[in-house]
C-alpha cells in the first residue's frame, strides 16, 4: 500500500469514526416520572445515549485494564457512514434497509462490527419510535461482551436500562443498570436515583428508599447537588412507609433549600398530624410571611392555631389577609371567627363591624346576641336594643331569657322603664317555662326595682 493510499484510508477511517461518534451521542428523550399524592415529586432520568459515560466520569477515574477489541473493516465503515447519511437526510426507511442489508452478511463480521451495525440499527428503530425494536438491537450489542469497546458497552447498557423503564419492563431496567454499575468507573448518584424510581414503580418502597439514601450519600460525599425532585421522591417514599420522623426531616431540608408553598404546607400538615401544634403554627406562619398561603384552609388553620396560642390579634390579621386574597368567602361562620378574634384582641370597634355583617348573613340570632352584649359594654344602648331584638326575631338561641335581660337593661339605661319592665316580664315567663330559677329571680328583682323606681319618679313629679 502506497503512502497516498494509507492517507486516504486514514481519512476514510476518521470520517467513519466521526459518524459513529455522532450516532452514539444523539440525545434520547428525557423521561420524567410524575408521582401521585404530595403535590407531585418527579425524577429526571439521564437523557443522552452518552449519558452513561458522563455519569461515570463525574468521579475520579480508576485504572482499568485496556480492552483489546477487533477492528472495523472498511466495508463496515462505509455501511455505517451510508446509514448515517440517510439518517441525517431523515430517510429512516432507507437507513434501516441499508443496515439490514449489511447484516445479511453478518457471518463475515467480527463481534465489534456486528455490535456497531446493531447499535446503528437500534438507533434507527429509536428514531422511528419503535422502542421494542430498539431494545432488541441494543441487547444484541451488549451480548458481544468483551469484544466491543468499553465505552460502547457501558453506554448501551445504560440505554437499555432506560428504554426498559420506558417500556415498563422494570426487571430488565434494574438488571441492566446493575450491570452498568458493576462496569462503570466510580458511578455517580444518578443511577441510584434511577433504580429508586424503578423500585417505586414496582411498589418496593424499602428498596426504593435504600437506593435514594445511597444516591444522596454519594452526591453529598462528592459535593454535588441533590435536586429538589430527588428530595421530594424520598419524602414521598417515607410518607408511603408512614415514617413520619423522616418525612419531617426531609421536608425541613426542602423548605430550607427550596422554600415553596407546597413544602411548607406539607410540613405544617405532618406536624399537625403528629401533634406538634406549635411547630405546625410556626411552619404556617413562615409560609404566611413568605406569601405562600393560597387556600382557605391555609388561612383558617393558621388563624385557629394562633387563637389556641392566645394571639387573637395575629389571628384576625391572617383572616383579613385571607379575605383580601379572595381565598376566603365572607360567610357568617368565618366572619364570626374574625369578630371573636377582634373581640379577644380588645379591638371592639373592629369586632362590632364584623359581627354586624355576620349577623345579617346568619340563619339564627346568636351573632346578634353577641352584638347586644358588646353594645351594652360599649354603652351603645340603642344599638344594644336593636341587636337584642334581632336576636329574638331570628331565634335559635341557647337561652332566650338572657337576651331579654340584656334588652331590658339597655332599655332601662335609655330611661324606657315601661319597655324595660316588659322585657323583664317576658324574661321571667321564658325562664319559668325552662325551669331556670336563677334567671326567674334576676328578672323578678328587676321588675321590683323598676316598679319602685317608677313610683319614686311619680312621687317626685307630684311633689314638684
PLM feature spans:
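N-terminal leader/linker segments that initiate helical-solenoid repeat arrays
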Residues: 2-10, 32-143, 151-155, 201, ...
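Residue-level recognition of tetratricopeptide repeat
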Residues: 84, 123, 162, 197, ...
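Generic helix N-cap/helix-start motif at coil->alpha-helix transitions
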Residues: 72-81, 111-118, 149-159, 184-194, ...
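Solenoid-like repeat scaffolds
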Residues: 65-71, 103-110, 142-149, 178-186, ...
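Alpha-helical adaptor scaffolds
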Residues: 154, 332-346, 353-401
